[in-house]
Amino acid sequence: MHTEADPTVWQGRVDAEEGALGQRWHQVVRSADAASPLNGAVALAGFACDAGIARNHGRVGAQAGPAAIRRMLANLPARPGRAIVDAGDVTCRGDALEAAQDALSGVLHGLLDRGAFPIALGGGHELAWASFGGLARHLAARSAQPPRIGILNLDAHFDLRAGERGSSGTPFRQIAEDCARRGWPFRYACLGISAYANTEALFARARQLGVRWLRDDEMDLLHLPRVLQTVDAFLADVDHVYLTICLDVLPAGVAPGVSAPSARGVPMEVIEPIVDRVAASGKLRLADVAELNPSLDIDHRTARVAARLVARVVDGVAPQGAAHG
């Protein structure tokens, strides 16, 4: 289920005449050797799974997302002094979603324990349950006090659906229930919500759980100062941040390769300043990008956007330490 990094995906242009400053990602990414320390390194972990999308009656194909993101990352310019490792993929076989989520949670937990900053590449947004699980296990082992974790989701959907089985539509409800069992606070903000893609039941559940949100029509450039104030207020209330980006938060013309394209969406001119603010906070512990479906993409638009957002996080985040109390 967990496979080592495939080095053949890391290929691209080589500008040898430019020296070290002309390097690209494919020239600097290394395999995450299980025996080596990772203090300060960015660690990519793929989640090749769309079983949660299938359970949520969406359009499948996101299982191929991690490889597509890596291919777009490969030719991006590398920044000097930043170590990047590839921790391989967790692949979901058939409908074995829970096993795949457990496996990814374990991979992320291990990367955090080794001092890395993990970025998970989806895959459906069911990966959020695994991402939170990995961070929760890491933090729970370091303090008897409930950690103040903030989940910031850039998404057109709350993903708070009810249901006996987990799916791409349930992860944050599952996290809320897990926090309640642990006696931890549930701090969740969802920015980019579409009023026409969430039922009244989901808005009611969000209010019941104390979720903070902004609608997509409140997130254009004219509203950017207020959006960043909302982000700052959220960051001030927490010690550890998990940033998750569902690509369907973007306009359909920018991100067509998703299961549920947005009729409106939030422009990159707003999404990127949010990412920058969170990455620079010193509190970001883990990030992921979800819902890329290459079979629905046009000219790799969505994959390119996903890679740009991953690189934006990498460029903005400070090197992580080995422990987060």
UniProtKB/Swiss-Prot annotation:
What cofactors does this protein use?
Mn(2+)
Q: Name one GO molecular function term.
A: formimidoylglutamase activity
Family annotation (InterPro entries): HutG (IPR005923), Ureohydrolase (IPR006035), Ureohydrolase_dom_sf (IPR023696)
Name the EC number(s).
Answer: 3.5.3.8
Cite the binding residues for Mn(2+) 2.
D155, H157, C246, D248
Catalytic reaction annotation: N-formimidoyl-L-glutamate + H2O = formamide + L-glutamate
Query: Which pathway is it part of?
Result: Amino-acid degradation; L-histidine degradation into L-glutamate; L-glutamate from N-formimidoyl-L-glutamate (hydrolase route): step 1/1
Q: Which Gene Ontology BP annotations are present? A: L-histidine catabolic process to glutamate and formamide; L-histidine catabolic process to glutamate and formate; putrescine biosynthetic process from arginine, via agmatine
Cite the entry's keywords alphabetically.
Answer: Histidine metabolism, Hydrolase, Manganese, Metal-binding
Instruction: Relay the cofactor remark from the entry.
Output: Binds 2 manganese ions per subunit.
Record's Gene3D superfamilies? Ureohydrolase domain (3.40.800.10)
* Binding residue positions for Mn(2+) 1: H125, D155, D159, C246
Q: What family, per the record?
A: Belongs to the arginase family.
The function of this protein is: Catalyzes the conversion of N-formimidoyl-L-glutamate to L-glutamate and formamide.
- According to UniProt, the name of this protein is Formimidoylglutamase
